Curated annotation (Swiss-Prot):
The keyword Lipid biosynthesis appears for this protein: no
Subunit structure as annotated in this protein's UniProt entry: Homodimer.
UniProt source species: Salmonella typhimurium (strain LT2 / SGSC1412 / ATCC 700720)
Protein name listed in UniProt: Ribonuclease 3
Catalytic reaction(s) noted: Endonucleolytic cleavage to 5'-phosphomonoester
Additional record remark: This organism contains small helical (90-110 nucleotide) intervening sequences (IVSs) in all 7 23S rRNA genes at either the 550-bp or 1170-bp positions or both, accumulating the 23S rRNA as 2.4, 1.7, 1.6, 0.7, and 0.5 kb pieces.
Gene Ontology biological process: mRNA processing; regulation of gene expression; RNA processing; rRNA processing; tRNA processing
Function comment: Digests double-stranded RNA. Involved in the processing of ribosomal RNA transcript to yield the immediate precursors to the large and small rRNAs (23S and 16S). Removes small helical intervening sequences (IVSs) from all 7 of the 23S rRNA transcripts. Probably also processes some mRNAs, and tRNAs when they are encoded in the rRNA operon. Probably processes pre-crRNA and tracrRNA of type II CRISPR loci if present in the organism.
An example Gene Ontology molecular-function term: rRNA binding
Cross-referenced HAMAP family: RNase_III
NCBIfam families xrefs: RNaseIII (TIGR02191)
The entry's keywords: Cytoplasm, Endonuclease, Hydrolase, Magnesium, Metal-binding, mRNA processing, Nuclease, RNA-binding, rRNA processing, rRNA-binding, tRNA processing
């Protein structure tokens, strides 16, 4: 991989790996090599959840568990991680197999989100929990400063349903229109039909649930509720 690109990525991350092989593995999708990033992703997912939960616990001493859970879900969900990945220009650094390259995997939200989690796992193994915690807090500083308890933190499907129910409109319908990839690495495409919108909105995700949430979020944007 181009060392100039890698060095630029590490500057954007705010961390230089002592063991570059961990960085290479974190950037490697299953389609490219047997030494891929899924174990690092598993580790990073748990670390991210802990760090964000800990930050919210101390920032909001009077907020109940339900609101903290919703805020955490907002901060660690796939599209938030994909936003971070785009801020890092992560797509240009991914190691993908020929099929994923051809289908635009470097832009796919689920792959970008998974790679951010893998990088977190890699940084932890390369350093320690204190270092990776501070790094995550640096990445999330603006988002943590801006987030607040309340209805806005409910997941998109819940907010869309409550909006429609409040206006005595039919509930949205979700239809799976495409499933791509093998069992271990699928991408679902969902059409969401909503009263008040002339055409279905589209959502994609690595599971049906995530795709439905993505579609609901797009519907909320079209209804100008986001």
């Amino acid at each position: 991989m181009n060392p100039i690109v890698i060095n630029r990525l590490q500057r954007k991350l705010g961390y230089t790996f002592n063991h570059q092989e961990l960085l290479q593995q974190a950037l490697t999708h299953r389609s490219a090599s047997s030494k891929h990033n899924e174990r690092l992703e598993f580790l990073g997912d748990s670390i991210l959840s802990f760090v964000i939960a800990n930050a919210l616990y101390h920032r909001f001493p009077r907020v109940d568990e339900g609101d903290m859970s919703r805020m955490r879900a907002t901060l660690v969900r796939g599209n938030t991680l994909a936003e971070l990945a785009r801020e890092f220009d992560l797509g240009e650094c991914l190691r993908l197999g020929p099929g994923e390259l051809k289908s635009g995997g470097f832009r796919r939200e689920s792959i970008l989100a998974d790679t951010v989690e893998a990088l977190i796992g890699g940084v932890f193994l390369d350093s320690n929990i204190q270092t990776v915690e501070q790094l995550i807090l640096n990445w999330y500083k603006t988002r943590l400063d801006e987030i607040s308890p309340g209805d806005k933190q409910k997941d998109p499907k819940t907010r869309l349903q409550e909006y429609l129910q409040g206006r005595h409109l039919p509930l949205p319908s979700y239809l799976v229109v495409q499933v791509r990839g093998e069992a271990h690495d699928q991408e679902f495409t969902i059409h969401c039909q909503v009263s008040g919108l002339s055409e279905p909105v589209v959502g994609t995700g690595s599971s049906r649930r995530k795709a439905e949430q993505a579609a609901a979020e797009q519907a909320l944007k079209k209804l100008e509720l986001e």
